[in-house]
């Protein structure tokens, strides 16, 4: 399947939940892009007036190919897909695509980088930034926690596990604050298979103070919600922006890996421009 032929497809046509044959030869046609606008329409977002900037940062831990003499090379890849791309890349298709490199010979890692950049950019419909770290060069990885207030120790009763933005409230009579709030209790489900997705969610904002207990209830309300990682983060961003009216807002999540990949969406009004690729302990 050619990525350019699938840009209007929804998730139901993806390889998720289907039996597949793993390819041992390079196969860019395995990439399955999904139109972002299908789910953005539900949020009332127009493609030319998005309320956020940002990216989807992917870490690929099972990247390997053969060198010119047939010897395997192992590496870690990082892919940054801009939110302005018309398409996201379905995760199982990306895993299958990366596996197709396993028996393919490349003269040097530069060719792998260029091939990944070309194929992923074609699938997403926008330039994708690619970096590759060969394991023989001993790349390092930093683990850490967000610098902010952890919500998970708030002692509250919760009985709602379907998304409910009504939990989100701010004190509009109080002075403006600048703070970072986070939780390890984000859990949603794959849009297609229903498999659980686990993540840490971080909100950084400047504006009226957000009610922390309500925010925690809202995060937990995603527990039975079915959407892709990127779509959940955009929904959270839009709900917080509309109901809490922060002057500046950034939302990002670090999801646990599946199939050798983790996905880390980042959305911001623009004041907060980036987040560090610091691994969450479950990654």
Curated annotation (Swiss-Prot):
Record keyword NADP present: yes
Reaction catalysed by this enzyme: 7-aminomethyl-7-carbaguanine + 2 NADP(+) = 7-cyano-7-deazaguanine + 2 NADPH + 3 H(+)
Pathway involvement of the protein, from the record: tRNA modification; tRNA-queuosine biosynthesis
Subcellular location, record wording: Cytoplasm
Origin superkingdom: Bacteria
Broad enzyme group: oxidoreductase
Binding site for substrate: 89-91, 229-230
GO BP term, pick one: tRNA modification
The keyword Ribonucleoprotein is annotated on this UniProt entry: no
This enzyme's EC code(s): 1.7.1.13
Catalytic residue positions: 190, 197
Binding positions for NADPH per the UniProt entry: 91-92, 258-259
Sections of the chain in a coiled coil: none
Task of the protein: Catalyzes the NADPH-dependent reduction of 7-cyano-7-deazaguanine (preQ0) to 7-aminomethyl-7-deazaguanine (preQ1).
Subunit details: Homodimer.
Record-given protein name: NADPH-dependent 7-cyano-7-deazaguanine reductase
Gene: queF
């Amino acid at each position: 399947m050619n990525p350019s032929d699938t840009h209007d497809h929804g998730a139901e046509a993806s390889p998720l939940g289907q039996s597949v044959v793993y390819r041992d030869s390079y196969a860019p046609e395995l990439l399955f892009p999904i139109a972002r606008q299908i789910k953005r329409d539900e949020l009332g977002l127009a493609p030319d007036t998005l309320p956020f900037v940002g990216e989807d940062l992917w870490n690929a831990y099972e990247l390997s190919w053969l060198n010119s003499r047939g010897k395997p090379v192992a590496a870690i890849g990082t892919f940054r897909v801009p939110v302005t791309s018309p398409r996201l890349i379905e995760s199982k298709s990306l895993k299958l695509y990366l596996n197709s490199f396993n028996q393919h010979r490349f003269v040097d890692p530069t060719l792998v980088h260029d091939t990944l950049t070309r194929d992923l950019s074609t699938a997403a419909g926008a330039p994708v930034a690619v970096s590759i770290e060969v394991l023989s060069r001993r790349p390092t990885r930093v683990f850490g926690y967000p610098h902010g207030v952890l919500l998970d120790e708030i002692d509250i009763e919760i009985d709602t596990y379907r998304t409910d933005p009504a939990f989100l409230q701010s004190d509009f009579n109080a002075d403006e604050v600048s703070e970072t709030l986070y939780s390890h209790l984000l859990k949603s489900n794959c849009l297609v298979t229903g498999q659980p997705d686990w993540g840490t969610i971080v909100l950084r904002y400047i504006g009226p103070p957000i009610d922390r207990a309500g925010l925690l209830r809202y995060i937990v309300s995603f527990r039975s919600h079915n959407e892709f990682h990127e779509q959940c983060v955009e929904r959270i961003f839009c709900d917080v922006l509309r109901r809490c009216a922060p002057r500046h807002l950034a939302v990002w999540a670090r999801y646990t890996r599946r199939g050798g990949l983790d996905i880390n969406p980042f959305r911001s009004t623009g004041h907060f421009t980036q987040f560090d690729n610091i691994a969450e302990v479950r990654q």
